[in-house]
């Protein structure tokens, strides 16, 4: 497959994110049909409906690009490019009427062109770049849309992260006592037990701790300097693919490690805090 125009792909992703965001906004306070309810999680019919709309828009623009999504995959799994989609990140918040949820869309490539360019530009961060140490794909653009605030974050590899068209950067806070830190909690007993001691330690040392329930938005907030660090022990690729690129493109770092079941361990920060916090046991 020939090289995809990032400008055209970004435009398609923005269109799809806004369309799905409109569905979210229009149905926010209406009764919602639950497809499944598991321990600590909810799956909505609206998740499926939003992903179907996103898929339709993206495939109309790029029919040969595959899609990996929270609500299922589409297209040729061996394609050189793939979309990575979370149609509603923060579904539990959304279901309970809390306006903290978003649409997250990333485009990834297998091409070594992007990997080489990324490594040359980010030699200092080479070990931190999202998935480059342990994946055949590299994220080349990301879009996150919050339909409740009408905030749209965009990033393309090698460029700057933008919020509603304006460049944003990570914070410059270097002391944990000045930092606002967010954590996410996975659903297994083991991961909860490993995460809680770190939550207590961070709560004692950080300025404030936040548990906000949307990994994509937390990463967008790190990229914008609203949060200083976000950490989660077990998370899916579609939750973080777009946001991790945004953190990197705004001057921060996103450190990931593979976890069981195809999941990831992740810590994103402004580039000044992670190594000071000794989070190694949380990410193992």
Question: What does each of the following model-derived ranges do?
Answer:
Residues 1-11, 15, 193-204, 217-284:
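Oxyanion/phosphate-interacting regions
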Residues 1-88, 110-115, 121-122, 129-130:
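N-terminal subdomain of lithium-sensitive/metallo-dependent phosphomonoesterases centered on the IMPase/IPPase/PAP
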Residues 20, 24, 47, 58, ...:
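Residue-level signal for inorganic ion chemistry
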Residues 23, 64-66, 208, 228, ...:
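Residue-level detector of anion-binding/catalytic polar loops
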Residues 70, 212-214, 257:
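Conserved beta-strand termini and adjacent loop/short-helix elements that scaffold enzyme active sites
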Residues 78-115, 125, 129, 134-162, ...:
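DPxDG-like acidic metal-binding loop motif
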Residues 159, 163-168, 194-201:
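Anionic-ligand binding region
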Residues 168-190, 203-212:
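Short loop->beta-strand "edge-of-pocket" segments that line small-molecule binding or catalytic clefts
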């Amino acid at each position: 497959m020939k090289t995809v125009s990032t400008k055209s792909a970004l435009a398609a992703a923005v269109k799809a994110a806004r369309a799905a965001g409109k569905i979210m906004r229009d149905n926010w306070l209406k009764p919602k049909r639950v497809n499944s309810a598991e321990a600590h999680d909810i799956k909505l019919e609206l998740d499926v409906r939003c992903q179907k709309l996103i898929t339709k828009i993206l495939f109309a623009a790029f029919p040969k690009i595959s899609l990996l999504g929270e609500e299922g995959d589409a297209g040729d799994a061996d394609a050189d490019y793939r979309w990575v989609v979370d149609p509603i990140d923060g579904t539990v918040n959304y279901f309970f009427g809390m306006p903290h949820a978003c649409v997250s869309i990333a485009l990834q490539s297998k091409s070594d062109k992007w990997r080489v360019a990324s490594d040359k530009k980010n030699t200092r961060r080479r070990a931190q770049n999202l998935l480059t140490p342990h994946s055949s794909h590299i994220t080349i653009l990301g879009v996150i849309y919050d339909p409740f605030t009408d905030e749209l974050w965009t990033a393309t590899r090698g460029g700057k992260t933008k919020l509603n068209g304006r460049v944003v950067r990570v914070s410059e806070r270097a002391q944990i006592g000045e930092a606002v830190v967010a954590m996410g909690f996975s659903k297994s007993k083991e991961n909860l037990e490993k995460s809680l001691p770190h939550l207590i330690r961070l709560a004692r040392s950080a300025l404030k701790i936040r548990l906000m329930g949307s990994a994509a938005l937390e990463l967008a907030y790190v990229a914008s300097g609203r949060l200083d660090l976000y950490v989660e022990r077990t998370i899916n690729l579609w939750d973080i693919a777009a946001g991790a690129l945004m953190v990197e493109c705004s001057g921060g770092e996103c450190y990931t490690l593979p976890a069981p079941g195809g999941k990831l361990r992740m810590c994103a920060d402004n580039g000044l805090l992670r190594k000071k916090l000794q989070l190694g046991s949380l990410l193992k």
